[in-house]
């Protein structure tokens, strides 16, 4: 089905029924900053190159009216794990996000099997793509991030150890970070594979590429770094369990170098096979291939 209004979009994506939802034109939210909850089994895809969500973002979670009423806004807490239907099997593709009052995309509350692909995500009020609260098996690929500060968070708090440990398996690849400042991503507890991304911000201050937080487990390879500030940074709370492998296939053309590199992170090839693009080719590849308007729907 094709939607052109905010009300139609809410109705189309908030339940758990399988549905392909095509967004046509620009959809605005009438002034609310609330994120729209996304239910299971949804493909949300923009039509053409200009499909735009303006003023709001998408919340891939169990945060919908019936759960809020039943659990009194506490449904994402550890005590309620397994007591409601988690959101799963979601694709968000070929959309432009502008002027979001909160996050552009939020994945939380044990949501799993989510693919965020070929979107253009302009500076939001908070995070651009945040993944947290026990979510799992997420891929963030071929997106263009523009001017964001808090770009991508993986786990929201050091107190989330019980909820997040053993989950938060996320692949980040072929993303273009254009004039963004930090969190590409910033990781706690999760297992993140960060490969073939381009950090493109040589002028901003207070910048870093990957933030290593409590018990993070990160494998980074084939990235092209042209960003002011630290390339990998201990956020001050990484602790003895944090691991990061900074592979020799990464290329740093500008930046303060690698502050944190234990060399003993997980091996992503134990999960899937992949072929790296040469890091030096990423500016050309991603200017042509990242963001909305590249895939045809």
PLM regions: where:
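Short glycine/acidic-rich loop motifs that flank beta-strands on beta-rich extracellular proteins
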Residues: 12, 31-34, 49, 54-58, ...
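Extracellular beta-strand-rich solenoid/capping regions of secreted or surface-exposed proteins
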Residues: 10-18, 27-43, 52-91, 99-110
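Right-handed parallel beta-helix/beta-solenoid
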Residues: 1-7
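Right-handed parallel beta-helix
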Residues: 40-46, 68-71, 86-99, 111-125, ...
